[in-house]
C-alpha cells in the first residue's frame, strides 16, 4: 500500500483557536466540499508560520463562514491569522494506481476565499512518471 495525497487546502488562514474543546479542526463544509474532505476525516496540518506539524480530524462548522478553527490541543500549535496547509491522504495498491488519481488543491486569499482549484496530475509514460499541475475551474456561484 502506498499513501498518496487526495486533497489539500493550501494557505487557508486560522480564524480562531479554541483550547477548551474536545479536539479537532472545524472547517467550512462548503470549502471541504470543493476539496472532497469529509467530516471526521483524518488530516495533517502544517503551519507555514511556525513550521509546526500536527494531525487531527475534521468537523464541519457553519456553511459559508470560511472558518478554520483549531480546537483542543491543536489550538496550542497556531495563532489566529496563521497560514496553514491541511492535507488528506488515501492509500492505493501501488505506484501504478497513482496516475488514476488527481488530488484537488484549493488555494486561498487572506479572507479564506477560494482563489483557485487545481489538480495534481501524474502520468505514466516511457517507463517513468511525469507530474503537472492543472487548473480545475470552480463551479459558478
Curated annotation (Swiss-Prot):
Domain of life: Bacteria
InterPro entries tied to this protein: Asp_de-COase-like_dom_sf, Asp_decarbox
GO CC aspect terms: cytosol
Entry keywords, A to Z: Autocatalytic cleavage, Cytoplasm, Decarboxylase, Lyase, Pantothenate biosynthesis, Pyruvate, Schiff base, Zymogen
GO biological process per UniProt: alanine biosynthetic process; pantothenate biosynthetic process
Enzyme class: lyase
Alphabetized GO MF terms: aspartate 1-decarboxylase activity
Cofactor annotation remark: Binds 1 pyruvoyl group covalently per subunit.
Keyword field contains Cell membrane: no
Entry's EC annotation: 4.1.1.11
Residues recorded with modification Pyruvic acid (Ser): 24
Post-translational modification: Is synthesized initially as an inactive proenzyme, which is activated by self-cleavage at a specific serine bond to produce a beta-subunit with a hydroxyl group at its C-terminus and an alpha-subunit with a pyruvoyl group at its N-terminus.
Binding-site residues for substrate, renumbered to this chain: 56, 72-74
Active site positions: 24, 57
Pathway: Cofactor biosynthesis; (R)-pantothenate biosynthesis; beta-alanine from L-aspartate: step 1/1
Cofactor requirements of the protein: pyruvate
UniProt keyword annotation of Ligase present: no
Reactions that this protein is recorded to catalyse: L-aspartate + H(+) = beta-alanine + CO2
HAMAP family the record matches: PanD (MF_00446)
Function: Catalyzes the pyruvoyl-dependent decarboxylation of aspartate to produce beta-alanine.
Family label: Belongs to the PanD family.
Assembly and interaction partners: Heterooctamer of four alpha and four beta subunits.
Protein's name in the database: Aspartate 1-decarboxylase
Amino acid at each position: 500500500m502506498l499513501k498518496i495525497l487526495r486533497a489539500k487546502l493550501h494557505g487557508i488562514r486560522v480564524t480562531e483557536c479554541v483550547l477548551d474543546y474536545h479536539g479537532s479542526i472545524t472547517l467550512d463544509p462548503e470549502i471541504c466540499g470543493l476539496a472532497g474532505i469529509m467530516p471526521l476525516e483524518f488530516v495533517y496540518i502544517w503551519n507555514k508560520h511556525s513550521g509546526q506539524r500536527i494531525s487531527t480530524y475534521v468537523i464541519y462548522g457553519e456553511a459559508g463562514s470560511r472558518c478554520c478553527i483549531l480546537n483542543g490541543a491543536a489550538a496550542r500549535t497556531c495563532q489566529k491569522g496563521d497560514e496553514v496547509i491541511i492535507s488528506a491522504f488515501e492509500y492505493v495498491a501501488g505506484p501504478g494506481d497513482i496516475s488514476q488519481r488527481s488530488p484537488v488543491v484549493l488555494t486561498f486569499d487572506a479572507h479564506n476565499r477560494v482563489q483557485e482549484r487545481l489538480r495534481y496530475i501524474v502520468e505514466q509514460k516511457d517507463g517513468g512518471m511525469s507530474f503537472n499541475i492543472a487548473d480545475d475551474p470552480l463551479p459558478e456561484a
